[in-house]
């Protein structure tokens, strides 16, 4: 996917997601384990993404309920494999089991609660943990901003410490680089102010994270922080504050201090700036598509597209076993 030029500010939200979806259509559809798609919204998102050639779904959940939902809302699932599971918790466990059995390259949330799915994903026994901390990224299409914006973490890590933030940042950078958004993203580590002060611990952590990047402990991105939100995304604000930085004013990844601030930032962008947001969980054995009941059809498809492109890149980069 060709990155959006930094100088071309978009005036409508469709173009970035259109290109994202088009890029996902150009690669083979990702085998996707869809957990408990038992309502119209979640099942329609699966059907639409499959019809677009982005995913090849396996539906996991109460088969009778899934078929009744499809029939009631005139959704054609005749070509989909269905793995029966009695309820949402069993569906999550079965979905994780199918990933272990190499039946899917990504996991997708249906109509169950996020906590139910993530309990199965993060379980110490039989889950999908890796050595990397699991984190969430919103891939946001803000109409008035030139670049696609990543915001992390607004859904998984409540009060991340320095080590957790290291993984949160690395997860986001890896997604940006591997899913085709570009190379060496500009990463702004946000706080309330752009100066380091002992009275605001997040400013100290931001400075430490930047030094960790200098020492090669975080790779693949260009970090700066602490930065306040205005001087992270607005060149004039950065200039007025006298901030000289390759990141300030044109950040592509926004790293928030904690889940509360991240959630508020993402929802502010969605409701005030009319942004679309695609949610994906990283750091597990496979990418996990997390959608919300409030997501638009385009945002649901974009979530699948992001995860599909990432899964494709991982497949391409996987080491081959000599015969």
Q: What label would you give each PLM region?
A:
Residues 1-247, 251-323:
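Anion-binding alpha/beta catalytic cores of soluble intermediary-metabolism enzymes, centered on
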């Amino acid at each position: 996917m060709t990155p959006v030029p930094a100088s071309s500010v978009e005036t409508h939200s469709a173009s970035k997601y259109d290109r994202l979806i088009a890029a996902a259509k150009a690669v083979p559809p990702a085998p996707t384990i869809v957990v408990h798609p038992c309502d119209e919204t979640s099942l329609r998102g699966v059907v639409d993404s499959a019809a677009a050639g982005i995913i090849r779904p396996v539906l996991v959940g109460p088969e009778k309920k899934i078929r009744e939902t499809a029939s009631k809302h005139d959704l054609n699932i005749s070509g989909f494999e269905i793995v029966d599971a009695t309820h949402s918790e069993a569906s999550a466990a079965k979905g994780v089991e199918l990933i272990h059995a190499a039946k899917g390259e990504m996991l997708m949330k249906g109509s169950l609660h996020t906590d139910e799915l993530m309990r199965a994903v993060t379980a110490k026994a039989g889950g999908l943990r890796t050595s990397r901390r699991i984190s969430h990224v919103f891939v946001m299409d803000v109409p008035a901003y030139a670049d696609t914006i990543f915001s992390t973490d607004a859904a998984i890590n409540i009060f991340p410490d320095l080590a957790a933030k290291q993984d949160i940042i690395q997860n986001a950078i890896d997604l940006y680089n591997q899913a085709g958004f570009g190379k060496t993203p500009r990463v702004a580590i946000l706080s309330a102010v752009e100066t380091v002060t002992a009275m605001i611990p997040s400013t100290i952590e931001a400075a430490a994270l930047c030094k960790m990047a200098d020492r090669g402990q975080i790779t693949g991105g260009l970090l700066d922080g602490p930065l306040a939100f205005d001087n992270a995304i607005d060149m004039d604000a950065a200039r007025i504050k006298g901030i000289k930085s390759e990141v300030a004013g044109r950040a592509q990844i926004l790293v928030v201090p904690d889940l509360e601030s991240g959630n508020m930032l993402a929802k502010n962008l969605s409701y005030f700036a009319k942004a679309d947001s695609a949610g994906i969980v990283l750091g597990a054995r496979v990418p996990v598509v997390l959608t919300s009941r409030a997501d638009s059809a385009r945002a649901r498809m974009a979530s699948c597209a992001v995860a599909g492109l990432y899964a494709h890149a991982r497949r391409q980069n996987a080491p081959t076993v000599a015969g």
